[in-house]
UniProtKB/Swiss-Prot annotation:
Organism: Lachancea thermotolerans (strain ATCC 56472 / CBS 6340 / NRRL Y-8284)
Family in the record: Belongs to the AIM39 family.
Transmembrane segments: 83-102
Classification of source organism: Eukaryota, Fungi, Dikarya, Ascomycota, Saccharomycotina
Keyword Cell division: no
Feature: transit peptide: 1-31
Mitochondrion among keywords: yes
Name used for this protein in its record: Altered inheritance of mitochondria protein 39, mitochondrial
UniProt-annotated location(s): Mitochondrion membrane
Membrane topology: Single-pass membrane protein
The encoding gene: AIM39
Record's GO cellular component terms: mitochondrial membrane
Annotated keywords: Membrane, Mitochondrion, Transit peptide, Transmembrane, Transmembrane helix
Amino acid sequence: MLTRSWRQRNLASLLYSLSHRRLLSQKIPDPKHVFTDPSNNEIVDSKHFFTNPSRDNLIEEEAIAKSIEASIKNQRRRRGKQVSSALAAALFATIFGYTIGYKVLYLHEHSFIPAYPVPKARNFSSNELKHINVDEIKHLAEYKLLEKLSMHPMIKEQYGVPLHKSQGISLESRQFSVWRQDVDPCIAGILIAPIDSPKDEHTWHNVPPLCKWRITNRSVNFRSFADQVLGRVGIDSSDLIQVIKPEKDCGDFKYGRPPHHSDGPRTMHICFLGEMKLGNEDLIIFRGTCHIDLKLQQVDLLRKENDKLVRYVLYHETKE
């Protein structure tokens, strides 16, 4: 009797341990999915909720979508070309209709069409050089240079005064070049004139029987443009801006006249750069400007010392 009850207890404990191990080995179910198993759920494509397309249908749909996209792009491109061509035609008709039709043919005046900006510093043309006495500018620059060098203590001590290339022969510039420096920003463009306008020294290209044209440069004076705009509403720029020092505002052009060969009231400097040999291997480099008066801006001395090229700044213009 005891052995039978003992066997029953062992069997019960064995079954309990097996069932406990099975429960521990099983995965705890997700409380969010008590009644369903998410592993068996299929993800349905939202684009094809009611249909299950085959591969052939997908290829056809992609081809249709690509053709629609291409047609939309072509339509937008065609519309953009039409708008841009219409704007270009309107701009062309407005500019050339006003400049040629109204100003040149009707009013018989010169007209300027701006094209692109150009730098302020540029070389003189052959026609402009005819009206500039380069030899006189060179002579004045050499005179100013020798004056500055003769007053410099280093030149007095090492080279002596007066300065001479050799006995009885004064120093002269070895190289001398000039160019122009405009004050205001400059724009290159087409200058159009009536076909029967008087001839001048410039080279013109005729468009018979309408007009003639040439490429030229014009300066843009923002202050005069602002004066014109304010003058239309009855306001003067002096009412808004008070110039404390007129010489600082106008610079060297306060009492200057524009060159008579220029196309308009353009203020410009004549800039120059020269070289003068001082001694056997010493070289003087000088540069400056010329408008009403000639001014030196900088004078440098270049010479070799211990097989090295050394630069001495003998004079540099300081602006107050």
